[in-house]
Amino acid sequence: MLQDKQAIIQVLGSILKDPTILSESNKYKITSDDFPSRFHSILFFAMSNLFHQGTEVLNDVEIDGYLKDYDIQYKIFHDNKGLEYIEKIQELAVVENFDYHYKRLKKFSLLREMDGLGFDIKEIYDESLIDPKEQEKMQEQFDKKSIDEILTAYEMKIVDIKEKFRTSSESVGIQGGEGINELLDSFEESPDIGVPLNSEMLTSIFRGSRKKKFYLRSSITGGGKTRNMVADACRLSATELYDPKKKEWVSNPWSESSTVISTEMMAEELQSLALAYISSVEEKKILRNTINEKEKQLVRKAAKVLQESNIWFEHLPDFNIQEIERTIEKNVIKNNVEYVYFDYIHSSVTIFSEMSKKSGVNLREDQILLLMSDKLKGLCNKYDVYMMSATQLNGDWKEAWLKGQVIDASYLRGSKAIADKTDAAMIILPLSKKEKDAIDPILKEGFYPEPNFVTHVFKNRGNEYDKVKVFSHINMGNMRIKDCFTTNLDNELITVEKLNIKAG
């Protein structure tokens, strides 16, 4: 079994001696997967849970008492003489050497991961070596290698394979100045600016929704991922929108073709959202039929607008990448769609089967989500479309939100690497108590309306504004947005130059 028993003893023993190691999650990322033995995994699980539940001293009594509630785990613990083992590793552990043994532990975890994916790990660590001198040489070389160096070695193998078998016409090489004047001319004729998002502030920050760009806007369950996408699509494609301030219908200068691909909501649910946005009448009133006569006229007019607009709704409940591509291709060819909203990046039974079959190995959910993100970016380029998608958030978001900590890719469900494939990425959350207190001086000036949502922008490739927070007031009933102001990560007011985009 690929493991370093000495490293495991030292890591577990050091945690027993100094449980605060577990609080340094930014420095030490230890999980049950780092321990291939079920016994060691159970022991770490118990120690970690006890610490995070407030236990300050970890010992055999606490751990034994905790595991008694879990019959299977408790049996494994006692079959391996867990109480004696705890006493032994506490005596052997040297906390001062924890960093060294932690790195050894993680390197072996990485090797098991690569081995499980089908990679040949013998050139990094060969357990089959018999000659003591060869073993010593290998161990010496292995000790010198960092995790990043091991990862780079495998990344280079993948690059070599891609170059050997690549047939895509997208891969080209040019001299640095080739076509540069034509490029400048194209910027003069048509600046690299897209069409508006539903938020004017986000439009300015991202330079609009641009073709061949992949944006990610993640949120919590029920946080409005689909609602925001429908609103964006209507902002671009509805022929008219009702202006409640002017109390009149206003012609929409944008007449783009868009499609919203939903994996959960039925077409009828997307339609009621669209009616609410176009008419500015709250959706719940439409669904409950509690609208007055004036609102009824607005909704009926919105229905006519929706019928005349180039907005297309698709429902893919159990999807795979091929089905997503077919749906996009159909809309591009048949409906001239250039703006795609896919709700949202998550695993399904079909996609698990498809990805595992193609790779030849059983992939984890985080690996599948990363591959999906990569594929979606590829579809943007292939079909020359803009794409917006989303993910759920992982279980750590709420604590960070409550504490007013920085919200970034670390809180994406599955893998923060999903954002690596995007051109812009953000997380939208309700205004927290910490943020409300922090912006109180800004609101007291009396120049800005009070927000109820914050969009945490943590990636914005090729643009001026990165790692900023956009405070907005969003009416979740009709998805009309009023931008309030923008701050840096310290909630200090910053000025974002408004980008005026004109149709045509």
Swiss-Prot record:
One Pfam family per UniProt: DnaB_C
Gene Ontology MF term list: ATP binding; DNA helicase activity
Cellular component terms per the entry's GO annotation: cytosol
GO biological process entries: DNA replication
Signal peptide: none
Protein name: SPbeta prophage-derived uncharacterized protein YorI
The organism of origin for this protein: Bacillus subtilis (strain 168)
Gene name of this polypeptide: yorI
